[in-house]
């Protein structure tokens, strides 16, 4: 019975991009580039179907390295011997496993990439083998239950790996069981649950189990199991949860989590989910037998409850989702160059649950503390680095859910000082009276000792001259005497080197017209002036900053413009100033050797900024006290405050009533009035001044007003229907905003019309919308006076107006009399009867006519209902020349009453199947004469009593119907009529016959043409066809 779908054989390639990259090292001379292995592809875990026709598995491994890397593989921690001709082949760095088997090849694989720099180890890849066996061949026992009960059909899937998906068949493929509120297929066990059975569930059931693997899908069917239903049990019973989710469900961050919950019950229970210690995300599916969390996070951890509810009660089940996580890097190591003899500290850190442990590898081997190396969990420390410490290092973080690797190369260097990559600048311009910094940065390992000279004079630190620890020469208060050659000397134990530059002194840059501070209003324009003088041999540029941040003049739609009239003018213009444009502006004029700057303050007045610190206190049922702190007035006094509220999460902000009604600008607290009890609110504050209304504050913390008794009566009170002896009352459930408190429900009062005693019923739950009162003494269609109020744990609300509701109806008890039926055509009969009297069982809706052929059983009768209280009906769609038995029953909403005595009727013979033939016509000046051969019926056809003719001389006009008892007809026509379309058919007791159609044309004075039914005169086909259809419809709709 198993079926499998596969793709044609191909090479399975499993690869992943390396998680942590490494950069290549360049030597000091920029010649040969040498760097250790950096993974570009790493193997991924493989699920290989045991029955697969694939002949090989490829585990990918590729590393970038110089010189190129060589590769080795480990299986279950042991290095593999990859010999020519064996089942395990090395192709590049990839491992190819030929004809893989579970016994020999299932396990954990790692790739090792090496070159002279060092070795790195790939992540682990697990090769697993998937399978799905066949279902047992034994016949399955029938499942028995009463109709109306819930039932479970077990799947009992065969041995398999990994998990399966399930569907169920009813009787035959592909008649799958639908996913609806009454049926549920557990994807955990495969079992089929039916909450409440009915007659349509009878049949044979088969479980379909499907395995989805990396590149194949296989399905198997179970033997059919028969579901037998005994007599219907109409009793109502409370929900009982049968498909339950575990008490604890473990999940990894990012996985999909599915909780299953399904219950038996009558009526079919409704399923609702809630998070006991939090709220459900609106993106989750929460009203079905499964709660799905598409991508679980730590915020989703907690206790969840499933509630199954119907009118008879409820059942609940709870379970906890525990979220854990694979390791994830917070901090990784990176490629590092270090000087010989120096100290180095590397660190890496990872998050995960459980907390990951960290270990270190050097060239693929475990690294432990020894001599100059100290390993402390996530820290690796080196003292006095030597050349032997160079190599490839890996930080490994792992917990029970996975392992991650971070790789880096350590290059320990010993180099003599070398200025070829970074010499001292050849020409060093400097401004008179200014300061110059001349770096000295030779490449050297270990770090070189640096000395400076001017000409032949060694420089020592003074008030004007300083050599910093990193070798930079600083000269202050520069004068012409400082011009000359300056040489940096660098030396370490590997050697020495020097580099020389020439210092040239230039005139200083000065601001000649500084910008002035200004006050402006929002939307104004302002120009800040800035002029400068400079050394004429050098270029001058202006830059502007606002509060020390550079101004971007190229930003599209920006507010800043600058003047480019002269090199010495750098004015700034602010267009349509906004509040954010206020602050400290700095104009800087600069050359390559020095700069000068001046500042100005711009104050922009505008509407107030948002208030802060919105706090709610003194929470009542309809009032709260709100306080806030003043925001920025933006240089214009605050005139007033406005308070707004909303109901999260999606409510709109609305202005609220306050005390005082008008809140002045110096206030920092006010009372909010007119709130709804037991409602969640957020509040915000908006300030205004003479220049406008500012931005609102951030929302306050969410609060809930205190509870109060309901203040509004439920609406939509109605009812009716149900089983005998029942009174069903319906109402519209009250929304959250009208509940005013917890413990919400409804108090129903009802009494028979005319009685003085009220009965009451308490219906808990805000979502409740109906109540069923059952009492055998309640007569059918008895009027009850009904009223309703709501309640919560703070008290009862107001009562609604009284409504009149009727108890359940019963079927009519009296049958119609004097039923008479007569065939009126070959396919129709008329039926008439005497009406029944309206009784106390309910409202009579109409009559149901049942009719069946003589010789058939009444169980095979067809039925037709009248839409009102008419006492006659025409039944169509009958067979010709056939005797029918007919009964009539009255019906109401509860069903149909007893049948009348049967009447008989026989339909007429069918009309002749031949149309009139040999049609001829003659035009005169004012009339048209048409003749045809009479139609003689066969013995099994009804008599011909006359003929109908449809005549149309204008395609835009409605055809005219003419009747005749003869085989000819003469009709008046205008003299200018040149052609017409005519249809002629028989009529009689059996109805109208098949039409003959002819297109007649006036041929000069008098003409005659004989109609040939095989080859008739034909106008444009579309004209004839479209208008023939119209004429047929017209003839059929007329009753003669």
UniProtKB/Swiss-Prot annotation:
Compartments, as annotated in UniProt: Cell membrane
PROSITE patterns: FN3, IG_LIKE
Lineage, broadest ranks: Eukaryota, Metazoa, Chordata, Craniata, Vertebrata
Pfam family, one: fn3
Role this protein plays: In conjunction with another transmembrane protein, CNTNAP2, contributes to the organization of axonal domains at nodes of Ranvier by maintaining voltage-gated potassium channels at the juxtaparanodal region. May be involved in cell adhesion.
TM helices/strands, residue ranges: none
Protein name in UniProt: Contactin-2
GO biological process: adult walking behavior; axon guidance; axonal fasciculation; cell adhesion; central nervous system myelination; cerebral cortex GABAergic interneuron migration; clustering of voltage-gated potassium channels; dendrite self-avoidance
Disease with which this protein is associated in UniProt: Epilepsy, early-onset, 5, with or without developmental delay: An autosomal recessive neurologic disorder characterized by a combination of various seizure types with onset in the first decade of life or during adolescence. Most patients have developmental delay, impaired intellectual development, and behavioral abnormalities.
CDD domains found in the cross-reference section: FN3 (cd00063), Ig2_Contactin-2-like (cd05727), Ig4_Contactin-2-like (cd05728), Ig5_Contactin (cd04969), Ig6_Contactin-2 (cd05854), IgI_1_Contactin-2 (cd05850), IgI_3_Contactin (cd04968)
Xref: InterPro entries: Contactin-1_2_Ig1, FN3_dom, FN3_sf, Ig-like_dom, Ig-like_dom_sf, Ig-like_fold, Ig_I-set, Ig_sub
Location of the region described as Disordered in the Swiss-Prot/TrEMBL record: 694-720, 894-919
GO cellular component: axon; axon initial segment; cell surface; juxtaparanode region of axon; myelin sheath; neuronal cell body; node of Ranvier; plasma membrane
The Fibronectin type-III domain, residue ranges: 610-708, 713-810, 815-910, 915-1006
Coiled-coil region(s): none
